[in-house]
A protein has these predicted regions:
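PLD/PLD-like phosphodiesterase catalytic module centered on the HKD motif
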Residues: 2-326
């Protein structure tokens, strides 16, 4: 396969890896959600499982669009006008498919998320997800129309306020499309690091010589160094990438069907999530990512939030029902 330069980053919980340096990032895992796709007569497409700090998988009794549910409660600060106007609070939302439906250039990252910071509370929250047109800034209708059709993933972590700049700098090479940038006066200096749309000309992207496949890069990182099973969206346009099966080196094998306890089984064609799980039991890494394994996306910027945890990795390994094996 042709080798080429591409832009990417990998955000490891506890270690930030930019391919040129490693900086400690004191993050705390909050939750992972896996939403089911719509399945006629079985699922509405709003059911989901929840993995919290205790690392136990549960099916949540509320639907994902519930205004009193975990997503709504996590995003409550951006729904509340009094909080948004607070001097020491700020947030950004970024997406290659924003809620207003506008078209976003491919020069921006194929990435979606919300980043909130509260200087007074000395904390921040980062929610990385795969859902188009999400979130709308209304607690009662924050979930998008059409959001039930396909499976989606969400990962949420918290961090100390002083780590905000490091996280922002690690995101810069992915050039996310930021649609609202809202912050109080005292947070402005720090949040200006995330004013991508105003400072793109000043960014020096991180470069990595690779095949252009984020998941091949993850598999070959010294911290991971494992074969991977990978779930990504099977795009209707473009050429999907086959499993990566080098004679030497780490394999990256596409998942073809998924089975999630409490939700059921579905095919890759119904799953818009992007995640990978290591097969080496001594290196229990799980990543929730931005980009798909498709030729059209090998030049697209994006990254992943990864966590090394045996319980989470064991859970995600069980999701693999069938794969395109080498």
């Amino acid at each position: 396969m042709r080798r080429e330069w591409f832009h990417s980053f990998l955000q490891l919980i506890n270690v930030w890896v930019s391919y040129s340096q490693k900086v400690s990032v004191f993050s705390s895992f909050r939750f992972i959600l896996y939403k089911a796709p719509y399945q006629r007569g079985q699922l509405t497409g709003l059911e989901y499982i929840y993995i919290g700090p205790d690392k136990v998988l549960r099916r949540n009794s509320k639907l994902i669009n519930d205004p009193r549910g975990i997503l709504a409660n996590t995003l409550r600060p951006i729904f509340t006008s009094t909080m948004v106007s607070v001097t020491d609070f700020g947030f950004i939302s970024y997406s290659d498919q924003p809620p207003d439906g506008r078209s976003v250039s491919n020069t921006h990252g194929h990435s979606k998320g919300v980043l909130m910071v509260d200087k007074t509370g000395d904390q921040g929250v980062w929610l990385l997800h795969s859902t188009p047109r999400f979130p709308l800034r209304d607690q009662n209708i924050f979930w998008p129309n059409g959001g039930a059709a396909n499976a989606q993933t969400f990962i949420c972590v918290t961090f100390k306020y002083d780590q905000f700049r490091a996280i922002g700098n690690s995101m810069k090479p992915t050039c996310p499309h930021v649609y609202p940038l809202t912050f109080g006066r005292s947070s402005q200096r720090s949040l200006c690091d995330l004013s991508f749309k105003y400072s793109l000309s000043n960014i020096s992207p991180v470069l990595l010589l690779t095949v252009g496949d984020l998941y091949v890069s993850i598999a070959s990182l010294p911290e991971v160094n494992s074969d991977l099973y990978v779930q990504t969206w099977l795009e209707r346009s473009g050429t999907p990438a086959k499993s990566f099966c080098p004679p030497q080196g780490k394999k990256v094998q596409n998942i073809e069907s998924i089975h999630v306890t409490g939700l059921g089984e579905w095919e890759r064609t119904k799953d818009h999530s992007k995640w990978c799980v290591a097969t080496d039991q001594n290196r229990p890494w799980t990543c929730i990512a931005d980009v798909n394994r498709a030729d059209s996306q090998f030049k697209r910027r994006g990254g992943a939030l990864c966590i090394m945890d045996k319980d989470i990795t064991d859970t995600f390994s069980l999701f693999v029902m069938r794969a395109e094996l080498c």
